Amino acid sequence: MKKAFSFLILVFLCGMFSARLSAELSMPHIFADHMVLQRNEAINLWGSASPKEKVTVELNGQKTSVRADASGKWNATLRPMEAGGPYTLIVKGKKERLAFDDVLLGEVWICSGQSNMEFRLHAAMNAEKEIADAENYSFLRSFNVKQEMSHRPLSDLQGEWRVCCLLYTSDAADEE
């Protein structure tokens, strides 16, 4: 019985160790389809992979490779680019590949506030006109961060990028 228990502990520990060695290639939720990256500034990208894994990032003809550190964290920087898009951001590891589509380079604004930041366009006095015009602004994007409490800094945010469109300006947006 003692040998069987020791064997199970050994198998468990080996499983934990091998899982740490083969981490999944990943990036925080802020990197996603429909994102906007700041134009005319160095573009910083980061995530995690297996320790010491080579990670290659590609965007709009630029390509750079970095190596994850011993804990699997990696950081890559692309040179500044002019406004434009849509592009596809490709991130490749040894065995995995991430692709983020409909990526724009432009102005990034960070807005924060209280309940007034959750005001929906359909409640505005000129809502019909603004909603009708919304399809003309597909280059406008928003990343709505889900409310979350934490007593320490977070390495990821829960949320998603949205294209300015009828869905985002309608009652359906209130169902989030």
Model-inferred region functions:
Residues 1-4:
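Positively charged n-region of N-terminal signal peptides that target proteins for export
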Residues 8-16:
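Bacterial N-terminal signal peptides
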Residues 23-51, 103-107, 111:
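Non-catalytic, glycine-rich low-complexity segments
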Residues 53-112:
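Extended acidic/polar, glycine-enriched regions
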Residues 100-150:
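An acidic-aromatic substrate-binding cleft motif
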Residues 141-167:
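Short, conserved helix/loop micro-motifs enriched in His/Cys and acidic residues
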